[in-house]
Amino acid sequence: MPDIFTDNTDKQDSDPSRQGFEGQPNVVIVRYGELALKSTGVRNWYEKILMKNIAAMLDSRNIPYSLLRREWGRIFIETTDPRAAEAAADVFGVVSTSPALVTKPDLESAARTCAFLGTGLIREGESFAIRARRSGNHPFSSADVGRNCGDAVWDSLEKEGKHPRVNLTSPDKEIFVEMRQNLAYVYLETVKGVGGLPLGTQGSMVVLMSGGLDSPVAAWLMMKRGVMITPVYCNNSPYAEDAARERAFDCIRQLQTWAPGHQFATYEIPHGPNLRAFIGTCDRKNTCLLCKRMMYREAYEVMKKVGASGIITGSSLGQVASQTAANMHAEIYQLAIPIYHPLIAFDKSEIVDIARRIGTYDISTRPAGICTAVPERPEVKANYDLIVLEEKKLGIETMVGDALKAVKILKL
């Protein structure tokens, strides 16, 4: 493990003598969620991966830091850069972060730090509250911390000529104190994290990437659950414009920003010849179903090649004509392929909200033309056995093999 990492899970905190009170946040508290529920061995592994992912995110945004410390229930980033809290909050597995001031874990030091922050934070007429918690062995309670720190803030405000008010139910301003065994942390804000599990803890999957709104969101949601992705783009040229290809690749590039330290390998598969065969040989209304089944077969071969465990799609039940329950069954009929639909029950508005959050919305809504292979009246209630009969006209195995011979592997 690099020198920037330290493990203090047994000692709980590092030496307070090297910490100084300088009046500005000098550490970021990183909190994680459900990985804390894992067994000791699994939790230890997850935490180490999370630390590496946090370090990679900080490096990708050119945010300096001196150390990452792993302690029981927390990760601490030693930095004075105000961007660090937001950056760490964008790491999968992190539920929240807080830029904090570090001080000694005694009542006097904590009270002095709270008074300093409170004087600059609380304006005339505003109410305040101290939110205190502690861990480790201390000769005082959390209530003692709150009371002593509150008194110090009150006295400091009175010296400033302000008229302080305490409101523990609905205060205008809050000051948080986390008292640990060897250090105390005082902070004013909590930045919400993306949550989930650390990227890379749940293996890898292939994602069918179209560049529309849905597939990037589906990929991101699986990344949030710890899954590394291998994007597969089926190029429908000449039935699709080059703009569609660039849009898909730009979505992949944006997803890459959520996974610093993990380089995607994008597989581009020529799919136009397959569409030409479907249009020329089969009932026109079945083109979309045959197309999707072929994409699954091609993605399955990529899945086996890269050692992945499944295929991710952006399908959402009932969103378009081809995504009826009957059609989605037909798409996998007699195909023993593990398919994941993370958006299956999402409303379009929910998908749009996530796309905006992750930075793919503006890319996915760029004009890119339409696929001209789509029939005027696509099948919405497929006959499963008829689809299989249609495929027997085509020489499916040869088509899959020809497509994979022409695949391009790209680092975008």
Swiss-Prot record:
Entries under Gene3D superfamilies matching the protein: 3.30.2130.30, HUPs (3.40.50.620), THUMP domain-like (3.30.70.1510)
GO cellular component: cytosol
Residues of the THUMP domain: 82-190
GO BP terms, alphabetized: thiamine biosynthetic process; thiamine diphosphate biosynthetic process; thiazole biosynthetic process; tRNA 4-thiouridine biosynthesis
Keywords: ATP-binding, Cytoplasm, Nucleotide-binding, RNA-binding, Thiamine biosynthesis, Transferase, tRNA-binding
PROSITE patterns: THUMP
Location of region: Disordered: 1-22
UniProt-listed InterPro entries: Rossmann-like_a/b/a_fold (IPR014729), ThiI_AANH (IPR020536), ThiI_fer (IPR054173), ThiI_N (IPR049961), THUMP_dom (IPR004114), THUMP_ThiI (IPR049962), tRNA_STrfase (IPR003720), tRNA_sulfurtransferase_ThiI (IPR050102)
Keyword tRNA-binding: yes
The reaction(s) this protein catalyses: [ThiI sulfur-carrier protein]-S-sulfanyl-L-cysteine + a uridine in tRNA + 2 reduced [2Fe-2S]-[ferredoxin] + ATP + H(+) = [ThiI sulfur-carrier protein]-L-cysteine + a 4-thiouridine in tRNA + 2 oxidized [2Fe-2S]-[ferredoxin] + AMP + diphosphate; [ThiS sulfur-carrier protein]-C-terminal Gly-Gly-AMP + S-sulfanyl-L-cysteinyl-[cysteine desulfurase] + AH2 = [ThiS sulfur-carrier protein]-C-terminal-Gly-aminoethanethioate + L-cysteinyl-[cysteine desulfurase] + A + AMP + 2 H(+)
EC number: 2.8.1.4
Domain of life: Archaea
Pfam families: ThiI (PF02568), ThiI_fer (PF22025), THUMP (PF02926)
Pathway: Cofactor biosynthesis; thiamine diphosphate biosynthesis
Annotated residues for binding of ATP: L208, M209, K292, G314, Q323
Gene Ontology molecular function: ATP binding; CCA tRNA nucleotidyltransferase activity; tRNA binding; tRNA-uracil-4 sulfurtransferase activity
Localization: Cytoplasm
Keyword ATP-binding found: yes
Free-text function comment from the UniProt entry: Catalyzes the ATP-dependent transfer of a sulfur to tRNA to produce 4-thiouridine in position 8 of tRNAs, which functions as a near-UV photosensor. Also catalyzes the transfer of sulfur to the sulfur carrier protein ThiS, forming ThiS-thiocarboxylate. This is a step in the synthesis of thiazole, in the thiamine biosynthesis pathway. The sulfur is donated as persulfide by IscS.
Homology family: Belongs to the ThiI family.
NCBIfam families on file: tRNA uracil 4-sulfurtransferase ThiI (TIGR00342)
The protein's name: Probable tRNA sulfurtransferase
Species name: Methanosarcina acetivorans (strain ATCC 35395 / DSM 2834 / JCM 12185 / C2A)
Gene: thiI
